[in-house]
From Swiss-Prot:
Pfam families: LSM. One of its GO terms (cellular component) is P-body. InterPro entries: Lsm6/sSmF (IPR016487), LSM_dom_sf (IPR010920), Sm (IPR047575), Sm_dom_euk/arc (IPR001163). It comes from the Eukaryota. It is found in: Cytoplasm; Nucleus. The lineage of its organism: Eukaryota, Viridiplantae, Streptophyta, Embryophyta, Tracheophyta. Component of the heptameric LSM1-LSM7 complex that forms a seven-membered ring structure with a donut shape. The LSM subunits are arranged in the order LSM1, LSM2, LSM3, LSM6, LSM5, LSM7 and LSM4. Component of the heptameric LSM2-LSM8 complex that forms a seven-membered ring structure with a donut shape. The LSM subunits are arranged in the order LSM8, LSM2, LSM3, LSM6, LSM5, LSM7 and LSM4. LSM6B subunit interacts only with its two neighboring subunits, LSM3A or LSM3B and LSM5. This is Sm-like protein LSM36B. Expressed in roots, leaves, stems, flowers and siliques. Keywords: Cytoplasm, mRNA processing, mRNA splicing, Nucleus, Ribonucleoprotein, RNA-binding, Spliceosome. It comes from Arabidopsis thaliana. Component of LSM protein complexes, which are involved in RNA processing. Component of the cytoplasmic LSM1-LSM7 complex which is involved in mRNA degradation by promoting decapping and leading to accurate 5'-3' mRNA decay. The cytoplasmic LSM1-LSM7 complex regulates developmental gene expression by the decapping of specific development-related transcripts. Component of the nuclear LSM2-LSM8 complex which is involved splicing nuclear mRNAs. One of its GO terms (molecular function) is mRNA binding. Belongs to the snRNP Sm proteins family.
């Protein structure tokens, strides 16, 4: 067999596990419109509705606005990604 589907490390991480692990951490939320929101993920529900703090809005890679709190409706979300030093976290 090719080993497809076998566990490499003995544990399987699901998308739900990933989403739980990034709560309270810096994330990038990309919308279907192409706009990026970068901030701290505070809340996420089963419909992918998102609440963020310390949020920055980027349009075409340019910072357009900053918000204390931001709420994004789940049907607008293309993806959620963790960030690596993109916020002012000292990285």
């Amino acid at each position: 067999m090719s080993g497809v589907g076998e566990k490499a490390s003995g544990t399987t991480k699901t998308p739900a596990d990933f989403l739980k692990s990034i709560r309270g951490k810096p994330v990038v939320v990309k919308l279907n419109s192409g706009v990026d929101y970068r901030g701290i993920l505070t809340c996420l529900d089963g419909y992918m509705n998102i609440a963020m703090e310390q949020t920055e809005e980027y349009v075409n890679g340019q910072l357009k606005n900053t918000y204390g709190d931001a709420f994004v409706r789940g049907n607008n979300v293309l993806y959620i990604s963790t960030t690596k030093g993109t916020l002012s976290d000292g990285a």
